[in-house]
Regions:
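Intrinsically disordered, low-complexity proline-rich regions
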Residues: 16-19, 159
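Bacterial N-terminal signal peptides that target proteins for export
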Residues: 1-9
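Sec/Tat signal peptide C-region and signal peptidase I cleavage site
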Residues: 21-24
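Serine-dependent protease modules
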Residues: 26-290
């Protein structure tokens, strides 16, 4: 499918040159042929997108936790929470492992999982990581389940086409198309560790935990939030971060991170002069935690 898409994009470039050719240089009857070729090109590109959607949707599940946000959980004002009791996830192994958002799972004792064939299963929580807003669930089925593979989010580029699939407002496996608007987004007050992919693919309450696919059908992100006072600004956790968290959650049910045990602040020129530090590089240790 990737070779087919490259060929279509190459043809699109040629067709663009045809349309931009001066009118007085065009031969009689050339315009109808160009229009016919252009329409055929668009239809073929559309077929690529629809094929991708049909391939990707079966791995996406709808989640219905009993207590999605948990008791006393604060939600950042920038994040629009899920519709009550709903969210999305994506199956990542044929054995039934599902990755989703931690804020979708919350403190739920059990989570109902609705598969693409409308069958329902109860999921067990394998592990959660609030610092990245990720969680892993496990369902047991009597058959191998359709699943999606992770892609390499380090190769994601701005302008790349992406598909978001989720459960907005309970509308299961809704597909939206967009582009990558930005990468490496930080300081958006959504989680402790932030390195988000920004996209304009439509993401709404209930999309949380659903996958962001590239045109190969690979997961490049886990949709997590939108800006509540803007349109077309959504964020996804990069797949490479998700894979690192996933490995620890599968092995030990939690993520273990190093802790230095000190508080630091930038070493400003004023502080450097005060402490007699000749260099103005580095940081100042201002607190030690026992």
């Amino acid at each position: 499918m990737r070779r087919r898409l490259i060929a279509l994009l190459s043809l699109l470039s040629v067709m663009t040159l045809v349309y931009l050719k001066p009118a007085d240089a065009a031969e009689p009857g050339a315009a109808p042929a160009a229009e016919s070729n252009g329409l055929r090109l668009l239809e073929e590109m559309q077929a690529v997108i629809t094929e991708l959607a049909e391939t990707a949707k079966p791995s996406v599940v709808s989640l219905f936790p009993t207590n999605p946000l948990g008791k006393g959980r604060d939600v950042a004002p920038e994040r629009v929470p899920n519709a009550p009791g709903s969210g999305a996830g994506v199956i990542i192994t044929p054995a039934g492992h599902i990755i989703t958002n931690n804020h979708v799972v919350g403190d739920s004792a059990e989570i109902e999982v609705r598969l693409s064939d409308r069958s329902k299963l109860i999921a067990q929580v394998i592990g959660k990581d609030p610092d990245t807003d990720l969680a892993v669930l496990k369902v047991t089925a009597d058959r191998p389940l359709p699943y999606a593979n992770f892609g390499d989010s380090s190769t994601v580029r701005v302008g790349q086409w992406v598909l978001a699939v989720g459960n907005p407002f309970g509308l299961e496996r809704t597909v939206t198309l967009g582009v990558v608007s930005g990468i490496g987004r930080e300081n958006v007050n959504l989680s402790r560790y932030e390195n988000f992919i920004q996209t304009d693919a439509s993401i709404n309450p209930g999309n949380s935990g659903g996958p962001l696919f590239n045109l190969r059908g690979e997961i490049i992100g886990i949709n997590t939030a939108i800006i509540n006072f803007a349109q077309g600004i959504g964020f996804a956790i990069p797949s490479n971060m998700a894979k690192q968290v996933l490995q620890q959650l599968l092995e030990q049910g939690r993520v273990v991170r190093g802790w230095l045990g000190v508080g630091i602040q930038p070493l400003t020129p004023e502080l450097a002069r005060k402490f007699g530090v000749p260099e103005q590089e580095g940081v100042l240790v201002n607190e030690v935690f026992e």
